[in-house]
């Protein structure tokens, strides 16, 4: 069996060709980011290899967007607990179906910790999914802004929610969620700013990271988990 050896010295078979290609693309992106922004480069060296692919989502469009709705304005820990309780309401399927969610009484959803506004958003999303949201395959051929324009027509789906879909499900590598608190906090910490950067300032940093803003965002999120040195 043919094998390939990466820079790291790890031996990989052709069965892992996709992973090899991904890691090589990561290497290209990392080299670019380190050259264009040495301060970010120091953070990259400290954190190590990009693991963005390990956080990618599964499931159809309804599942991914409903998950993002549940995560809105909550800490990752709290959102994860609520999402797991939500999934437990539908033990017969890996990914809840839109019709099943629509048929679930609001009070049942409230008991697993979902707020009433989010119940309204998820059920509106379910109605759109049943009546004809684009499939993930149809979204694949659309550009980022067209996808954002299409999906933000659904109540409760804002730009940030769609950007999470772009990064973690559609694998778009040049998305900068300028309204994301984690990204902004990461910028403030990394560049020793006095306050959280506003949208314009965040976009200014992003100009140095294009076309790999998603990769830069991942490192900024991870930076918040680091202990002070």
Task: State where each predicted segment sits.
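Short helix-capping/linker segments at secondary-structure and domain boundaries
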Residues: 73-81, 130-134, 170-175, 223-229
């Amino acid at each position: 069996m043919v094998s390939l050896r990466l820079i790291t010295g790890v031996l990989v078979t052709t069965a892992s060709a996709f992973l090899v290609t991904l890691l090589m693309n990561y290497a290209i992106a990392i080299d670019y980011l380190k050259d264009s922004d040495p301060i970010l480069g120091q953070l990259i060296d400290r954190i190590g290899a990009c693991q963005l692919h390990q956080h990618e989502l599964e499931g159809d469009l309804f599942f991914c967007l409903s998950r993002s709705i549940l995560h809105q304005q909550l800490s990752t820990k709290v959102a994860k607990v609520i999402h797991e309780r939500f999934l437990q309401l539908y033990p017969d399927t890996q990914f809840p179906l839109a019709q099943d969610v629509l048929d679930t009484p609001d009070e049942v959803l409230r008991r697993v910790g979902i707020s009433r506004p989010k119940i309204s958003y998820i059920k509106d999303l379910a109605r759109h999914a049943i009546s004809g949201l684009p499939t993930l395959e149809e979204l694949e051929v659309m550009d980022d802004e067209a996808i954002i324009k299409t999906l933000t027509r659904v109540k409760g789906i804002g730009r940030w929610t769609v950007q999470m879909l772009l990064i973690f499900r559609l694998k778009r590598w040049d998305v900068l969620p300028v309204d994301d608190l984690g990204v902004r906090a990461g910028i403030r910490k990394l560049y020793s700013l006095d306050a959280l950067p506003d949208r314009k300032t965040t976009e200014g940093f992003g100009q140095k990271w294009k076309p790999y803003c998603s990769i830069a965002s991942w490192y900024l999120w991870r930076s918040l988990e680091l202990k002070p040195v």
